Structure formats: structure tokens, C-alpha cells
Amino acid sequence: MFYIDYFFISGLFALDLEFSVGENGKSLDDNNTVLIFGGIQGDEPGGFHAASLLLSDYNITKGKIIVAPNLAFDSIIKRSRGKNGDLNRKFASISPKDPDYQTVKRIKELILLPEVSMVINLHDGWGFYKPTYIDAMQNPKRWGNSSVIDTNEINASKYPDLESIATQTVNSVNASLVDPKHAYHLKNTKTQELGDAEMLKALTYFVISNRKAAFANEASKNLPVNLRAYYHLLAIENYLKTAGIEFTRTFELTPQGVDKAINQELEVKLFDDKILLSLKNPRQVINYVPFPVNKELNYNTSNELTAVIAENNSFYIQYGNRFQARLYPEYLEFSNPFNEVTFQVDSNETTVPFGTKVKVKENFLIPKIANVRVNIIGFDHSKDESNILVSKKNMQKPYSLDMAGKIYRVEFYELRGANLQQFLENSVESKLIKNAKILDLATLRTARAKDKFIGSILVEFE
């Protein structure tokens, strides 16, 4: 997949993105939930991708995990270690005036949940930790490919023997190495014993100070992202098994399987799921995307690392630290007379909800709807493109969402003056696009002179 990394896109201003928290599984009321963090530093994609997959592609069948995959979300988007300093050095004390104060407060609240008994923090570090010096990238001062603990043992009701659990995890990971050079080792920082000023400020030390087990898993920044995430997941799965948590996943746990999972098709749904953007090797620019003047700018995504961000007169979609597409809006009034339409797909009639995708082998047709016009982006036949049989050869490839020229938008509009009966919209849990510019009166007047947007559907040709 082709990406351009626009980590300079937003300059220095704050994006105000809050980290996500997801739950997977069901608590057995035994205070045995495992809490997993990723992305505490924004330049460590192996960790935050591994954490994200635990929510999108794992199914916890026994027990429960809580995952916050994108702790420093602004920094992840900007590919920065920490826009307000190192977030992982703010757990001993933090000023209420610090921009990260609320973030640290939320993280601590998760750690202190009574149900949480084990915490795993995912990192990517340069080089490979080795107990004895080999060379500049393989020595005791490096962090990559290590299981990190703060001390051998803690006073905890569950999982007090940190060294034993981490050693078993190291052995488990080393049984599935891609290359012997990637071997994991146990790294005990002996934080309190040595009075390590930096590690005393870290998240894991805060955890063990509250009598809960904490492990940091480090993958090497010298490895590709998919391989880092692979090693993270090997370690995580062993910790989950230690806690008696059972699971399935949608992909094979191999470097290739992880790569495919990380780079799977992204979905972004806009404005109460009226619009779906299916991003499969997407075009860098998507023009004339309907944006409402009479409702909030909200969205949902298929994973917790994807965000829609306002920037000047446009918006862009970012997946972790990878740029996906820039959206140029067309501001319109939105209408809600219905939320699904009839399609004829390859001679079969079907009902399709807005914000979904239909696969087409040969052709499709949208029956005429009274007081509604259909606009098939890339077809360019007439003002209303209903009751027309459309095949792939009729489409103009530059207007597709994807570089392959297979995915196209089909939009539905209420004719101006039709005044169709409105129905109550379904409430959809969503995120808000923050920092969008305030629209001027000219833009509002122009929007109110146009047909009203109802919703859209994607068609994907074989």
C-alpha cells in the first residue's frame, strides 16, 4: 500500500485527540482483567498497532481485557515522541497545568480499577537489549526485544512473581523467533533498588506501587512495524494465557498475518453513518464530500488508530502515523426521510442501508424515488441517474475512491422544496471532528440553495 507520511500536516497546533478505551470480553467478577496500553510514545507504531488489533481482530472468549491503544494520540498522528514531553515520565507527579494532566489522570483511573490485576505497556525501542555488551546496537543499555520489569517480586494478591512470569513470556516469544538475532531477554530495571530517577516516574512503577503486576514489552525499532507487532502479540498472548484469559483472532499469528491485519481495508463512517469511506489503497484527495451545515461533524472508524482531522478548509484521515486521504467538503443541508434504498445488483433486487458497500459483478440500477435524485460519482450521465443500468465500463476511473478504480460513491439528494417527511435519526455512538472552522454566511446561504443530502452508498466492482 502506498502512503505519504504527512506528519508535518498540522504544524504545531494541538489536535485535541483523546485516547480511546475499549473492552473485549466479559469480566468473571474475579478481579482478573488485564489492562493493555499502547502508544504512550507516538513514534512507536509496533506497540500501538498491536494494541489496536486486540480490539479489532481478537475475540476474548473467557475473561476480559481493557485496551487503550493510542495514549498519546496527538503524538501518534504527528509521529512525535511526545508533543508535551515524555508522557511516560509523568506518573510520579504532574502539575494540573500540564497539558497531559487529564490524560495521566484517565490512565491512572484505569490502572486503579478494582477489576484490573495485570497491566501491560507496549513500547518500541532502538537496538536489542543484551545482558552483555556485543556492539553499539546490542548491549545492556538498549531496550528493544526485551521483557521489562521494575523488580523481581511485588506484594500483590495476584501475579506477585514478576520475574517468573516475564521469564516464561521471554521463553514463549523465543520459541517463535523469525531470526535468532531477535532473541528476547528479561530486563529488570530494579527501579526502587537502584533509585532510578527516570523509571520511578514511569507508568509501570506507578502500577506496582499500587500492588498490581506490571510488564513492559519492548520490540526493536530496527525491525519493520509488522514484525514488532508480531513480537508484541506473542508476548501479550502469553500474558493472557498466564491470566487464564482465552481468545480467538481473525488472522494467523505470523509476520505476514500481522502485516495483512495492520494493512486491511479501513472504514470511516461520517455523520451518523450516512457516508462510508472505504479506504483500500485510497486516492490521496477525495473531492466534494457532503458535509452538513445543520448537524454535528461526527465519525466512526473500523479501528482506534484512525482519526478525521480538520485543517483549514479541508479535512484529512490519518491511520496512526500514516496519511490516508484528504477530504474537500461540499457543505449542504442534510435530510433524513429514509435510511435505506432499493438497489438492483446483477439483476437481483436488494435493500441497502446508507453507509454500507455493495459488491457488483456486472451492473447495478437504482429505481426512481419520488422527489429524490441520484448522483453516481464518476458516471456523469444526467442530473438524476436513477433508472439507468450502470456497469464498470461506464465509470470514469479518476472519480473512484481507490487507485484501482473499483469503488465509487452513489449519493441521494432530496430535491429542494420537496419537504419530505423527516424521521428521527438513529443515535450512533461516535467521535467528533474537532477544531473545524466556523462557516461564514455565504457558505450557509449557498448550502441552503442546493438539494439536501440524504445519504450515500458505495459500489465496488469486481
Could you say what each language-model-derived stretch is?
Residues M1-F2, E462:
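Universal eukaryotic N-terminal targeting presequences
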Residues F2-S10:
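Bacterial N-terminal signal peptides
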Residues L12-E462:
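Structured catalytic-domain cores with a bias toward divalent-metal coordination
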